[in-house]
């Protein structure tokens, strides 16, 4: 079973999030996370300050989604 998001830490005060399922993409957009929390992005990942990653992770879990590595 594949997860909905990839989340990793760069150990520089940021976390990288990547929606990998269609429902994760919709969830990310519906919750307006890009405008609320994203400080930068790469081709594949949204970069978020680590202090905000807990809010995002909790919202993902509350929506019955999960993470993959």
Go through the PLM ranges and name each one.
Residues 24-36:
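Short aromatic-glycine-(Arg/Gly/Cys) micro-motifs in beta-strand/loop hairpins
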Residues 9-12, 37-42:
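Short glycine-enriched loop/turn motifs at secondary-structure junctions
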Residues 40-69:
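Short, compact, well-ordered microdomains
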Residues 6, 17, 35-37, 54-56:
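Generic structural signal for short, flexible, solvent-exposed coil/loop and linker residues
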Residues 7, 18-19, 29, 39, ...:
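Intrinsically disordered, low-complexity regions enriched in small/polar residues
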Residues 1-27:
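N-terminal acidic leader/helix
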């Amino acid at each position: 079973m594949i997860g909905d998001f990839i989340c990793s830490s760069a150990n520089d005060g940021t976390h990288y999030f990547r929606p990998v399922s269609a429902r994760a993409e919709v969830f990310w957009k519906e919750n307006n996370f890009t405008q609320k929390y994203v400080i930068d992005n790469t081709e594949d990942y949204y970069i978020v300050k680590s202090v905000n990653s807990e809010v995002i992770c909790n919202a993902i879990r509350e929506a019955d989604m999960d993470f993959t590595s």
